[in-house]
């Protein structure tokens, strides 16, 4: 899980979600997991 100021989709399989006011990017590739912080 990468914690970044600006999260974005890296590939076509990435999905952007908003959980409890925090932007999260999930993907089948675990390297693409990101959280806004």
From Swiss-Prot:
GO terms for cellular component: chloroplast; ribonucleoprotein complex; ribosome. Keywords: Chloroplast, Plastid, Ribonucleoprotein, Ribosomal protein. It holds the Pfam family Ribosomal_L36. InterPro entries: Ribosomal_bL36, Ribosomal_bL36_sp. It is found in: Plastid, Chloroplast. One of its GO terms (biological process) is translation. SUPFAM superfamilies: Ribosomal protein L36 (SSF57840). Belongs to the bacterial ribosomal protein bL36 family. This is Large ribosomal subunit protein bL36c. The lineage of its organism: Eukaryota, Rhodophyta, Bangiophyceae, Cyanidiales, Cyanidiaceae. The gene is rpl36.
